Design a protein with these regions (language model features):
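Membrane-interface segments at loop-to-transmembrane junctions
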Residues: 8, 125-135, 166-170, 201-211, ...
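Hydrophobic alpha-helical segments characteristic of transmembrane helices
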Residues: 1-4, 105, 116-196, 205, ...
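Basic, amphipathic juxtamembrane/active-site segments
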Residues: 47, 54, 64-66, 70, ...
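Membrane-embedded transport module
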Residues: 148, 186, 432-484, 498-677
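Membrane-water interface of transmembrane alpha-helices in multipass transporters/channels
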Residues: 129, 155-168, 178-181, 198-209, ...
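Cytosolic catalytic regions of ATP/NTP-dependent phosphoryl-transfer enzymes
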Residues: 84-92, 211-382, 388, 401-402, ...
Length: 694
């Protein structure tokens, strides 16, 4: 069981996390998970990764508070310099002491989990279609069987034969292949998705993917790689875009050198790690790496000065000082004149508008044998700016373009700043013409106004967890079929409410995975678009098999009904119906699952949410196809009887004709829209097996 350090009786003890209660004081250290919602009472350079709750990978600063516990514990997660820490979040730097305000179901995580019980997941289009089909065919079968029994019994008085005829007709009219075909298609679809690193928790959702009209995606970790990478280095002499593994020009070497010297080796801070990783590669063959220098003094970042410095002794014993931090703080350390400061801050804004997180770097010096007691005691010289980004996944632009080509609107929902969200959206190819709608603006809109706004806007920034759910519901109010991705506890309500909830596998929380329908094992956005392709293919092939099933039931039902109405010996006995429907039809239906996809599959717009699996035009096609088999088969039966053949011989002739017609119906429906090449596909092997046996 997990344990937590707790201050009790003036001593720090490790106790099981489940034994923590409100009022306990918990000790927080770098790399540790926070055990409960709490309010910071003491802290030193404490930053916390709250992506579990906010979806944003950049850690936030924490500041202790002496305010009343109840008032201090009221704020939402996210934002710098707040005193609250939350259960499940990760301490990335520093240490602290916090007073527990809530445990278990009373925490932010617990409340989000409890809210899932109140959300009813929407039925998939396939489920709605099947309910309609079951009602239609069930009603027809019951009515037809009952009328046939009454007609036969009242007309001839032979109630036993009438009952057998009614049973045969009911069996012929009830398409029991529907559930078999559906189960096989969805099971094999789930298997194919699993081979694409997409785990389907609910098989019915495989088909629903093909009906998606709006794909709502989180930025961090879905469109991006969920890591900080060094992207820009700006000095007075140069402005360089950094690329992993690529050499850097000499004018930015010193900037990167001192940015590394101001970073802690072994730190969990993502920007420190990005600087050190990139610098170790880019400066490997230069004199700007200093493994032999000794760290003399570290000056931690404080709420009053958002910059940190490290003093080093080089191989000659000379002190070298490096500082990095918020540009405003480093400008203050360098005592720059207002004009220079204004120029630097203008450059910072340009970098921020490009979606970068910006730090400033400075080089310091001081007289004296001992290191200074405060960062302000050094004479700093401004070196430049370093910009970081969470890199866009390489496969995303092509996948977004493919989704938009298929008529699917891609919307980004993130907790990040609007400028960053818009920059990433532009790189990904998401529509940014309407700008970004922020969480603050969403909160000011009523449901009707929000429903109107989501028609145009495709980028949503600074969004709170409960607002993600509102956005999904607003889209659904227009009849959109919504897919939603997420990984944090905060995403769970929206994942459950969406028609297709997609959780991240590697970094997703258990709560998010439980609420989702699909789990993206390798977190590659392009897999979602591949899943949409798979869903559309399954729906197309399901339509083909449903039309075939309707078509084959026309001659089966007709051959069971018409001879009785004409006063002839029964043609289709229950045994014949069982043989036809339970053996031949299912085997032929399997051929449809492996049918190749339409080459224009991803150029078509999504089908309408209310479009059923089998519409009246398709039913009519099936009836016409079935009638073309029924008429010659019935005619052969009548001619055989008129020629004086025994009823068994005539019946055998008709059943053989029905089997041949069945194969013809399979071939016609299998090749619909694809040409006869569909019969050569590997998935058509069951058809050829049955054809050879027949």
């Amino acid at each position: 069981a997990p344990h937590t350090r707790v201050l009790r009786g003036g001593q720090v003890r490790r106790v099981p996390t489940r034994e923590i209660v409100p009022g306990d004081w918990i000790v927080l250290g770098e790399g540790e998970r926070v055990a409960a919602d709490a309010v910071l009472r003491q802290a030193q350079s404490l930053t916390v990764d709250e992506s579990l709750l906010t979806g944003e990978s950049v850690p936030v600063r924490k500041r202790p508070s002496d305010a009343a516990l109840a008032a201090a514990a009221a704020g939402p997660p996210g934002g710098d310099d707040l005193p609250q820490v939350y259960a499940g979040t990760l301490v990335t730097t520093g240490h602290g002491l916090a007073e527990v305000s809530a445990t278990g179901g009373g925490t932010q995580v617990g409340r989000i989990g409890a809210s899932l019980a109140a959300i009813e997941p929407a039925a998939t289009p396939l489920q709605r279609s099947l309910r309609q089909l079951v009602r239609l065919f069930g009603t027809l079968a019951l009515a037809g069987s009952g009328l046939l029994v009454l007609w036969h019994g009242l007309r001839g008085g032979d109630w036993v034969q009438g009952l057998l005829a009614g049973i045969a007709l009911g069996m012929a009219m009830l398409p029991e292949e529907f559930p078999m075909a559906l189960t096989v298609f969805l099971a094999l679809g789930s298997w194919r998705l699993a081979r694409m690193q997409v785990l389907a928790r609910h098989p019915a959702v495989v088909e629903a993917l093909g009906a998606v009209t709006v794909l709502c995606v989180d930025k961090t970790g879905t469109l991006t790689e969920n890591r900080m990478a060094l992207r820009r280095l700006v000095t007075p002499e140069a402005d360089v875009t950094a690329q992993a593994g690529a050499p850097l020009p000499e004018p930015v070497h010193r900037l990167l050198e001192y940015a590394m010297l101001a970073s802690r080796r072994g730190s969990t801070d993502p920007m420190d790690r990005a600087l050190l990783t990139h610098g170790d590669q880019a400066l490997n063959d230069t004199e700007h790496l200093h493994p032999d220098w000794r760290l003399e003094q570290e000056y931690a970042l404080t709420p009053e000065l958002l910059a940190m410095s490290q003093a080093w002794l080089d191989e000659c014993g000379q002190r070298r000082v490096a500082a990095k931090g918020a540009p405003e703080a480093v400008i203050e350390l360098c005592h720059l004149p207002p004009t220079s400061a204004a120029d630097i801050l203008a450059q910072v804004r340009r970098l921020a508008d490009a979606g970068l997180r910006v730090l400033a770097v400075a080089e310091g010096s001081a007289a004296g044998a001992a290191p200074a007691t405060d960062q302000h005691d050094y004479d700093f010289r401004f070196l430049g700016l370093v910009g970081f980004e969470d890199p866009l996944r390489a496969s995303v632009p092509a996948a977004v373009a493919q989704a938009r080509g298929a008529g699917i609107a891609v919307a980004m929902i993130t907790g990040d700043h609007a400028a960053t969200a818009l920059a990433i959206a532009r790189q990904a190819g998401i529509d940014t013409a309407a700008g970004a709608l922020t969480g603050e603006q969403i909160a000011a809109l009523d449901d009707a106004a929000l429903a109107e706004a989501v028609r145009r806007v495709r980028v949503f920034a600074r969004v709170l967890p409960e607002q993600k759910l509102r956005l999904v519901e607003a889209l659904q109010s227009h009849g959109e079929t919504v897919a939603m991705t997420g990984d944090g506890v905060n995403d769970a309500p929206a994942l459950k409410a969406a028609h297709v909830g997609i959780a991240m596998g590697a970094r997703g929380t258990d709560v998010a995975r439980e609420a989702a329908d699909l789990v993206l094992l390798d977190e590659d956005f392009s897999r979602i678009v591949g899943g949409v392709r798979m869903g559309r293919r399954i729906f197309d092939n399901l339509r083909k098999v449903m039309r075939y099933i309707v078509a084959i039931h026309v001659p089966i039902a007709g051959l069971a009904l018409l001879p009785v109405l004409l006063g002839l010996p029964p043609l289709m006995l229950p045994a014949h119906v069982v043989l036809t429907e339970m053996v031949i039809d299912p085997i032929c239906s399997l051929a449809f699952e492996g049918a190749p996809e339409d080459p224009r599959l991803m150029q078509r717009p999504p089908r309408h949410a209310r479009e059923g699996l089998v519409g009246w035009p398709m039913l009519l096609q099936g009836v016409v196809q079935g009638g073309s088999v029924l008429l010659p088969t019935l005619l052969a039966y009548l001619l055989a009887l008129r020629a004086g053949q025994h009823a068994d011989v005539a019946r055998t002739l008709a059943v053989v004709g029905l089997m041949a017609g069945n194969l013809l119906l399979v071939a016609v429906n299998l090749s619909a829209g694809l040409g006869w090449r569909a019969l050569a596909a590997p998935g058509a092997r069951p058809f050829w097996v049955v054809a050879v046996i027949a």
